[in-house]
Amino acid sequence: LFPSESNQYPYPQSLTGTIFTRSLITGSKYRHNLKDSALTTGNNSYIYYNDKGLPIQTRKPYMEGSSGRQTIITNQYSFSGKLLQQVVYHGKSYTTLTNKYSYDHNGRLIQQTSKAKDQPEKIISENTYNTLGQLKSKNLGDGLELQTYEYTIRGWLASVNGDYVA
């Protein structure tokens, strides 16, 4: 009846993994030599997927040669498969970075925010679109930079920040 993009299910999908990962990369192992010794160590990386084949979690070594330290990236998606939230956790430094993404009714990115540890949430970018769905302006940071986009009558990108040149 309705395309999946118009189904704006308000709640994110659960982080349920799947065992049906045929033709998907689920892990890797690589070896590297340490500079100060003749010993060779190896590191493993793992990727977990949901039932739609989207990566819900990635685990990889925090640094080369660091034993037990991992970077864990966890993704949460909407019903239509758009990335809603990404949480990045870095090893033993206990650094957590949370990125959130907001979309309009057509599935276009309208806002991206980021939060580090106990800091307040900051706006990374805000996008506005014209009536044809083309990117009209992009506000980066909390008003640090505003990029404006202009298009030709055919819909081709004519200029970015054209006012600065004139």
Question: What are the language-model segments listed below?
Answer:
Residues 1-166:
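Beta-strand elements of repeat-based all-beta scaffolds
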